[in-house]
């Protein structure tokens, strides 16, 4: 008997708090093995660098192995979330339940993958 597959589209709500939580996990351990510096572009839009993206700002992420600097924006970040969900990265962590995120289940590894997908559309480190 043959198996058949259908493509399902869904809309997932991502709050500013979700973004801040994921960025905090990324900057406080998730990306530190490949990124040695996160630099706020312009003025701080929140109290911490982790709050920059949710407020429409930009972070420059400095590669610790290459002489490269990558710019992370809200648009790129949301694309990273989309790719992580579409490709079922860490789906067993239940960080995306139905139509919203559960950032209590986003650890440093999940945050790292989201940031890499945001910047490179692929996971190239780790």
Stretch-by-stretch model annotation:
Residues 1-64:
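Long, contiguous N-terminal structural blocks used for assembly/anchoring
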Residues 10, 14-18, 22, 68, ...:
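Alpha-helix boundary/N-cap detector
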Residues 31-35, 89-96, 122-123:
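Residue-level signal for secondary-structure boundary elements
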Residues 60-61, 68, 80, 84:
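Eukaryotic, polar/proline-rich low-complexity intrinsically disordered regions
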Residues 64-66, 122-123:
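Generic structural motif
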Residues 73-75, 79-84, 90-98:
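Acidic, low-complexity, intrinsically disordered interaction modules
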Residues 99-125:
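Acidic, proline/glycine-rich low-complexity IDRs
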């Amino acid at each position: 008997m043959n198996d058949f597959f259908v493509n399902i589209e869904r809309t997932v709500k991502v709050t500013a708090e979700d973004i801040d939580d994921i960025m905090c996990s990324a900057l406080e351990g998730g990306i530190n093995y490949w990124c040695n510096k996160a630099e706020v572009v312009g003025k701080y839009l929140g109290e911490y660098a982790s709050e920059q993206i949710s407020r429409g700002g930009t972070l420059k992420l400095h590669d610790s192995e290459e002489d490269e600097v990558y710019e992370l924006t809200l648009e790129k970040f949301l694309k990273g979330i989309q790719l992580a969900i579409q490709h079922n990265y860490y789906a067993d962590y239940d960080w995306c339940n139905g139509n919203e995120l559960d950032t209590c289940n986003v650890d440093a590894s999940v945050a790292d993958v989201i940031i890499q997908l945001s910047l490179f559309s692929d996971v190239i480190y780790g």
